[in-house]
A protein has these predicted regions:
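Active-site histidine-acidic residue metal-binding/catalytic motifs
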Residues: 57-62
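Short, solvent-exposed loop/turn elements at beta->coil junctions and helix N-caps
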Residues: 30-34
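Active-site/substrate-binding loop(s) of hydrolase catalytic cores
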Residues: 50, 65, 72-73, 77-211
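Conserved beta-strand elements of the Class I
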Residues: 52-55, 265
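Short beta-strand-to-loop junctions in surface cap/lid or active-site-entrance loops
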Residues: 42-51
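Conserved strand-to-helix beginnings and helix N-cap segments that scaffold or border functional pockets
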Residues: 67-68, 278
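C-terminal accessory segments enriched in acidic
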Residues: 1-19, 23-29, 84-86, 153, ...
Length: 291
């Protein structure tokens, strides 16, 4: 399984927009914000439920085709909903999404996505472009946005630690866009999708026994249907790493757990997995079913 993107950012944007135009009765297209290089961040809502589940990918260029697959999954779920189909002979898509709708954001870092595809020349802002070129970093698997900031470490969590001088939490447009949508919508969970070796990481709170138990229970449900390894997220009380930092501090999953206080899971699908679409489609439906 290659991790190089197949689609352009514009392909993904218009794929979601066209789905909302075709399935107007039960979808809504929305731009939640703009990147620092002035690219819009699209979101597609599917279903009519009062609560929602956020499904997000594309924080880093290392996510590769995950943004592509999540966008395609959104369109497929729309088709399943309209036709009243059951997925894998078990999940009644229309019934589940009218209970809890999905808010799908396939590419939260469109600048990084395009940099991985076409290099630094795709950055429109000449100042940002020159700054990135001066860093002399390879663009393959580029983990940052157009300002060279890793979004996965930019959220204002407890015990946040700066990775660079003058870097502050929520300094990036993309980060603030997600924080705004998290706080605006009444949600029941966050699922982020990326590539790794097949694991589900569930976030924890320092003094949140009930929250931690609920998050663990939902993570176990997803583990059973995926076969992935279950991994516990770290809190500050769990100790810091050898370099004095904690990989979960500053992450969107930890922020969501601390501020929204709803279950937050990072789903890392194996790069070699043959049917990524099946996993991306099944896990959000299983999550809603298990609520």
């Amino acid at each position: 399984m290659e991790t190089v993107q197949e689609k352009t950012y514009e392909n993904i944007y218009y794929l979601l927009w066209e789905a909302a135009q075709r399935y107007q009765k039960f979808t809504q297209f929305r731009v939640i914000g703009k990147s620092h290089d002035d690219r819009m961040i699209p979101m597609l809502e599917i279903g009519t439920g009062d609560l929602c589940i956020f499904c997000i990918a594309g924080f880093s260029g290392t996510d590769g085709q995950m943004s592509d697959r999540l966008a395609e999954t959104a369109v497929e779920l729309c088709r399943n909903y309209e036709c009243g189909w059951t997925v894998q002979e078990f999940y009644e898509v229309r019934k589940l999404l009218d209970q809890t709708r999905l808010c799908i954001i396939p590419v939260v870092n469109p600048d990084g996505y395009e940099i991985c595809r076409k290099g630094y020349g795709t950055v429109r802002n000449p100042i940002f472009r020159q700054m990135l070129k001066m860093q002399d970093r390879p663009t393959d698997g580029f983990p940052c946005n157009a300002r060279g900031i890793e979004l996965k470490q930019n959220f204002p969590t407890n015990y946040y630690q700066r990775q660079k001088i003058h870097q502050e939490p929520a300094s990036e447009n993309e980060t603030r866009a997600l924080i705004g949508i998290f706080q605006e919508y009444k949600s029941a969970g966050l699922l982020t999708f990326g590539y790794s070796h097949g694991k589900i990481i569930y976030s924890r709170q320092e003094k949140g026994f009930a929250y931690n138990q609920r998050n663990y229970r939902l993570a176990r449900y997803l583990q059973k249907c995926s076969g992935y390894r279950l991994e516990k997220g770290k809190t500050a009380s769990g100790g810091l790493g050898s370099k004095g930092n904690n990989p979960d501090m500053g992450s969107p999953e930890q922020f969501y757990a601390e501020v929204i206080r709803q279950p937050s899971l990072a789903i890392e699908i194996p790069v070699s997995h043959r049917d990524i679409m099946k996993e991306i489609r099944q896990l959000p439906l299983e999550y809603i079913y298990s609520l």
